[in-house]
Amino acid sequence: MNIQSLINDKVSQALEAAGAPAGSPAAVRQSAKAQFGDYQANGVMGVAKRLGTNPREFAQKVLDVLDLDGIASKTEIAGPGFINIFLSEEFLAKQAEAALADKRLGVAKEEQQNIVADYSAPNVAKEMHVGHLRSTIIGDAVVRTLEFLGHNVTRANHIGDWGTQFGMLIANLERIQKEKGEVSMELSDLEGFYRESKKLYDEDEEFAVTARGYVVKLQSGDEFCAEMWKKLVDVTMVQNQRNYDRLNVSLTRDNVMGESMYNSMLAPIVADLQKQGLAVESEGAQVVFLDEYKNKDGEPMGVIVQKRDGGFLYTTTDIACAKYRYEELNADRVLYFIDSRQHQHLMQAWTIVRKAGYVPESVSLEHHAFGMMLGKDGRPFKTRAGGTVRLADLLDEAEERAAKLIEEKNKDLPAEEKAKIATTVAMAAVKYSDLSKHRTTDYIFDWDNMLAFEGNTAPYMQYAYTRVASIFSKAGLSMDELTGEVKITDEKEKALVAKLMQFEEAVQAVASEGQPHLMCAYLFELAGQFSSFYEACPILNNEDDAVKQSRLKLAALTAKTIKQGLELLGIETLERM
């Protein structure tokens, strides 16, 4: 149950009954401090101002008609007109009981939408690097959350599998195949292969002529070029899949929807834009001038959709992409997890899409932009030599560092188990370190913080789960076979249950805002509340069996909530660390 939403509806009804205009926002929020209750309604002051009445007097009118029977134990007016709402222990206990009995932990499914999520999008014939990490794991966490809420989600891995560079790549692949007969080993170092192809193109004119010829042949559907192109795509995606699998990312080859997929749509789209009078010729190119965007002279900005040589641009592909996702995938909502530097480019493409009538306003096109991963020097994260960090190398180093950490803490565990723990902690640390930061900000990549067992980190959260699970293993009990009822008799119990009941609010916030850090913040707060509860409220050695059973239920619900929350982030838990 979403308690915030429930109370918001109740306060909205009371506002209207007290004389507020219909649809006035109740603005119910979780209270920042316990002294202000569990929730606070902040909408009264805005309404009172519009009505020209005293906010505290209007707040009292709202309270007089506010029906929170069976939900709140107390309400009060605070400050200039805030309404503080304190949930009743009986209500919280009842909700906790229901959540524990439900495999979804009380989280309701939403009305299903068709949602397309565009994320990861590496380039063919290049290895994934750290720059691909944020899109990949942020997108995947949001997708998992949307699916948990019952939505039909199409994962779209918009790989860079088209362009003039494929001429030189195909020419080099052909050269290797003629010389060695087998290419798979040669392509194990994709970056090296790409650099070699570029060097040959720049230095060998005969090679360059062949390469340019292959660009034309590939675009016209030549069988040999198509076969070579497919080989490059296949080898690249096999390597990318290793990274996805290591990171516990749910993308597969079936989710690939590369740039090439939209090739047949590009010429008809330009023709249609011309027909509608949106695209006009300018210096030999086809250009759409947008009043919404001005150049430095204050004139409408021109967006090229076809070059004078007949070639198309990324913008043309993005127009086709949005059109396809609406017309063929029936999208109600399209989420793009793309670097913030691409924002204007996307906005321009979508402006054209709307003007041309390809995607109606009822379909939400959303750019979930993100900042950069920086080194400790505050610059883009690089190798010591100043090169781009390969994602596979980053994950290898994470595993090595985690293995040392686990060895120091648990020397006596079997080697196989230590290796499993190290791998799980390493991947979790890399992901959580990123996901716990606000998506739109740049962040400093720091191994020490990432692998720390204190603070809002993956090791801390994984250990928090293990700590709760160990209560049951010590007692030889199953979390699913507990008896008795949840009874709240202590302030620490109430604080823990109130936080547990905010899980659905966190899930829905991640889904609507595309912000996984909200789930990380929630789980970290929950772990903190459990710590306070655990220190103040004895569980296994409690002499009152009813209290013991109730607290075991709260511990079980905490463990299940942490596990489910981490699963939505694509992070695995461990039964022991």
UniProtKB/Swiss-Prot annotation:
Reactions the enzyme catalyzes: tRNA(Arg) + L-arginine + ATP = L-arginyl-tRNA(Arg) + AMP + diphosphate
Motif ('HIGH' region): 122-132
Gene Ontology BP term (one): arginyl-tRNA aminoacylation
Gene3D superfamilies (UniProt xref): Arginyl tRNA synthetase N-terminal domain (3.30.1360.70), HUPs (3.40.50.620), Isoleucyl-tRNA Synthetase, Domain 1 (1.10.730.10)
GO cellular component, one term: cytoplasm
Coiled coil: none
Family statement: Belongs to the class-I aminoacyl-tRNA synthetase family.
NCBIfam families in the cross-refs: argS (TIGR00456)
Annotated source species: Aliivibrio fischeri (strain MJ11)
Quaternary structure and partners: Monomer.
EC annotation from Swiss-Prot or TrEMBL: 6.1.1.19
Source organism phylogeny: Bacteria, Pseudomonadati, Pseudomonadota, Gammaproteobacteria, Vibrionales
GO terms assigned for molecular function: arginine-tRNA ligase activity; ATP binding
Domain of life: Bacteria
Name of the featured protein: Arginine--tRNA ligase
PANTHER family in the record: ARGININE--TRNA LIGASE, CYTOPLASMIC, ARGINYL-TRNA SYNTHETASE
HAMAP family: Arg_tRNA_synth
